[in-house]
Amino acid sequence: AFPASAAGDEGFTIDFETNCNAIFMKNLDTGTVVFTKNADERIEPASTTKILTYIVVSENVEDLDGTTVTLTQELKDSLEGTGSSIANIMVGETMSIYEALNCLMVPSGNDAAVILADYVGGRKNQETGNPEKLSNIDRFVQMMNDKAAELGCTGTHFANPDGLHDENHYTTARDM
């Protein structure tokens, strides 16, 4: 006998201890759920948020090399005092979306996250006329939540593009 959460559909025993708070393991070849531990409990996604930021940006910018973004003082100030991981992008620095995506993923740059979210959210606000009067970043976060739902995430809600703590920013191991 073993806990139901440790049993796969094929009835085998998982023989290991875990130190993490939540796990969801699934055999992608068979669809068999192999192991779960608090798989549906809310957890903070932290910097794994940037995976969805990357996806939303890459799906909404056609020319990643030819499209550029620039860090503004306002965007830099939005990260002040947060203890953010940054890519050390300087105010006024212009780079391609491709370069900004690298700054987002390699050093986990929150400065890159807000630049990208501001750009993509701003373009979406222009396309829609922004009837809800959302900020560019709030529009981008709405796009992230729409994408998460499209991917089948039912226990996930994003509040920002960078993963900084917010009560309304959460996911589950099953969704991740």
Region spans (language model):
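Active-site-adjacent loops and short helices of periplasmic peptidoglycan-processing enzymes
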Residues: 6-174
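C-terminal segment of classical bacterial N-terminal signal peptides
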Residues: 1-5
